[in-house]
Amino acid sequence: MTITYEWRGDVDNSALNELHAEGFGHPVGRTDWETRLRRHSLGWVCARDARGRLVGFVNVAWDGGAHAFVLDTVVARAARSNGVGAALIRAAAKGSRDAGCAWLHVDFEERLRPFYFDACGFRETAAGLIAL
């Protein structure tokens, strides 16, 4: 499977809404991803198959300084277990580093611990959370 990865790649709202719905198990929404990403994100990575179909995505928010934050990592079912997710994170880390960030943060559901720690190289750190 040939996959290409692009930092701040072109975003098709329909394709990303469909991928997001498939990956997170909710109905297809009508989010204006392009506007949201350009307004609030340091960058994002789009993964596309040989036909140009969006098969993976990760968003990278930031604090305007040294800290970047991984959000919405998603891979199409048909492309899973082929290293696409880990490659998305590597591309997100490179884009964040190139932008001058020193840290890439992630929070996740416990079931994703092996992915983020083993496949992607994150390490455990103390953090806090308030549900709003």
Residues covered by each model-derived region:
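Small/polar loops that bind or transfer phosphate-bearing groups
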Residues: 8, 71, 107-108
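A conserved beta-strand-loop-helix scaffold within acyl/acetyltransferase catalytic domains
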Residues: 32-51, 55-74
